[in-house]
From Swiss-Prot:
Disulphide bond pairs: C4-C30, C8-C29, C12-C24
Similarity comment: Belongs to the beta-defensin family.
Name of the protein this chain belongs to: Defensin-like turtle egg white protein TEWP
The entry's keywords: Antibiotic, Antimicrobial, Defensin, Disulfide bond, Pyrrolidone carboxylic acid, Secreted
Region forming the signal peptide: none
Quaternary structure (record): Monomer.
Function: Antibacterial and antiviral peptide. Has strong inhibitory activity towards E.coli and S.typhimurium. Has significant antiviral activity against Chandipura virus.
Tissues of expression: Detected in egg white (at protein level).
GO biological process, one term: defense response to bacterium
One GO CC term, this protein: extracellular region
Length: 36
């Protein structure tokens, strides 16, 4: 069971992108995206 590299949440933020839910259950694993 891989751990989510970002945070587990219901909705991703503006500068986040959803990834495979790993161990988030019903939640989405959101990883921050680097912005310039």
């Amino acid at each position: 069971q891989k751990k989510c590299p970002g945070r587990c949440t219901l909705k991703c933020g503006k500068h986040e992108r959803p990834t495979l839910p790993y161990n988030c259950g019903k939640y989405i694993c959101c990883v921050p995206v680097k912005v310039k």
